[in-house]
Amino acid sequence: MYRLAFLVSLSATARLGVSALATHSYTLQTLKYVALISIALGWACEIMVGRLVGAGRLREADRMVRKAVRNGLLASGALVIFAALVAPWWMQIFTRDVVIIETAQTLLWLSVMLELGRVFNLVLVGALRATGDVHFPVLAGSASIVLFLGVGSYLLGRSFGLPGIWMAYVLDECVRGALMWWRWRRQAWLPYAKLILRRMRKSQSSHTPATQT
């Protein structure tokens, strides 16, 4: 689903011309380094939450997820702001075109919100999966991707050009992140985590040999 919607946004970018396509590419290449923080936190959080849920330490899992989100926001936010500030020099690695460099810097400033949304999205999706709450992230994420990344990038691109397409990216990440945060905050994952615990305990008890008297 994501790849198809991204191809739609890429097609919308290509319609704007070679310069827009180059700017799009250079900005994404920069952001992939920023996104490593969210990706790493998401993987680590999924592993740690899975272990804590398996041990029945649900409150500790909740605290750990909140701490991971907070640290991710600080680290990703600082790095993307730094990238936007140094863009006039950094982008000269790719091109000397002043228009491309200025547009890329604009996109990087827009990406501050994008990366903050990505932190919520990746960290919380991993955490929800680890608790057994797998359907909501898939359904909510798919709806946001189609609506904002796919349809939104096409419509906003026609009206506002490349910054409009970037706003569609921002909306997609932020909406998905907000939905995952809402899901976690209202503790809708708890029934799934408790179900996993019951199944584990039942499995352990069934494999425990009876004590001979």
Predicted regions and their residues:
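Short, loop-centered acidic/histidine patches that primarily coordinate divalent metals
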Residues: 142-143, 170
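Residue-level hotspots within pore-lining transmembrane alpha-helices
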Residues: 1, 5, 13, 34-38, ...
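Helix-terminus/linker motif at the lipid-water interface of multi-pass membrane proteins
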Residues: 3-33, 51, 89-98, 159
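Hydrophobic alpha-helical transmembrane segments in multi-pass integral membrane proteins
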Residues: 149-155
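Small-residue-rich hydrophobic transmembrane alpha-helices
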Residues: 23-87, 118-140, 151
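Short alpha-helical transmembrane segments in multi-pass integral membrane proteins
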Residues: 49-114, 155-213
